Amino acid sequence: GLPMAFGGPYLGFMATTRDMMRKLPGRIVGETVDSDGKRGFVLTLQAREQHIRREKASSNICSNRALCALTASVYLSAMGPEGLREVALQCTSKAHYLREKLRAAGLSPVYDKPFFHEFVTDCPADTARLSAKLEEEGYLGGLPLPGGRILWCTTEMNTKEEMDRLADLVKEVCCA
C-alpha cells in the first residue's frame, strides 16, 4: 500500500499472540466499530506510546506517521484477507522463480531453507560491477553483502519478463 519513500517513513504488517501484543514497539492500527456501528481504524494500544506513558514507552516514535497508518489501513481494507494472501503468494512464487533463474545464470543460493520473498546468492563476479550494470539497464539490483554475496527481493509488482531480463544481465556479467 505504501510506495518507497527514500528511506521512510514506512511500516509493516505483523501478527502476534494476545500475550505479546503489549510488548510490541511502535504504532499499531486496529479495526474497530464506531458509535454509529460503522467499521473504522484507530491507533490502538496507545498506553505504551511516549505521548501517554513516557516512562514505560517501548518505542522512540516522536513524530506522527498517522497518514502512513491510514494509507496502510485503506490498502488492507481494500485488499481483504484473500487479496493480501494473493499478494503474499505472488511474492513467494516470483522469488522462487527468480532464484531458479539466477541459479541457471550462474549464481549459487547461499541457504537451502524456506523463504518468503528475499534470498541470498553467492556472486562469482565483482558485486559492485554487477550492481552498476543492473543500474545502467534500469534495475535496482540486489543488495551487495560482504563476502561476494547479494540479497535479492521480489514483490507482486515484478513481471516474469523483468526477472528473465535480470537473469540474462546477471549471466552476461557473471559468466562472461
Model-derived features: positions:
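PLP-dependent enzyme catalytic core of the Aspartate aminotransferase-like
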Residues: 125, 129, 133-136, 146-176
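Membrane-embedded transmembrane-helix bundle of lipid-linked glycan/lipid transferases
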Residues: 86, 90, 98, 102-103, ...
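Conserved PLP-binding catalytic core of the aspartate aminotransferase-like
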Residues: 106-137
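Hydrophobic, well-ordered secondary-structure elements that form the walls
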Residues: 12, 91, 119, 134, ...
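Short, well-ordered alpha-helical packing segments
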Residues: 10-13, 99, 120, 131, ...
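Cofactor-binding beta-sheet edge motifs in enzyme active sites
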Residues: 72, 76-84, 112, 116-119, ...
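Active-site C-terminal subdomain of aminotransferase-like
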Residues: 2-105, 109-112
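A structural signal for short secondary-structure junctions
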Residues: 6-7, 93, 110-115, 135, ...
